[in-house]
Amino acid sequence: MSSCAAHWQVSTKYCIAPSREGALAYMQNMVRRTRAAAPGKRIVISETGWPDKGSAFHGAVPSTEGAMAYFVDTVQWAEADGIEVFYFAAFDEAWKVGAEGDVGAYWGLWDKDGQPKFT
């Protein structure tokens, strides 16, 4: 097999992971499983993130502290493990609040006005 693509969903409406920590552990497990199924293949995580505002869904709680911790933990793990990651999203997307529930608009590292959320 010269190339392959795998798709696994981490936390749309927090449907798989009950917590921020669980989302990262799930992603790490999926990378291990993908490596086992396709040894030597380049792995790119094309979208991951954690919202900083909105309603909790079971044990998944959006918060500024949680979003920052998820970002830092993801980047540190990805660098240590040689994984390429596209973090979602650069900016909050205010228009998504209806279609994606009240968390949909709050996945950015910067707010909708371009101000950084984390210092």
Tell me what each language-model feature is.
Residues 27-45, 55-83:
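Catalytic-core region of carbohydrate-active enzymes that cleave or remodel glycosidic bonds
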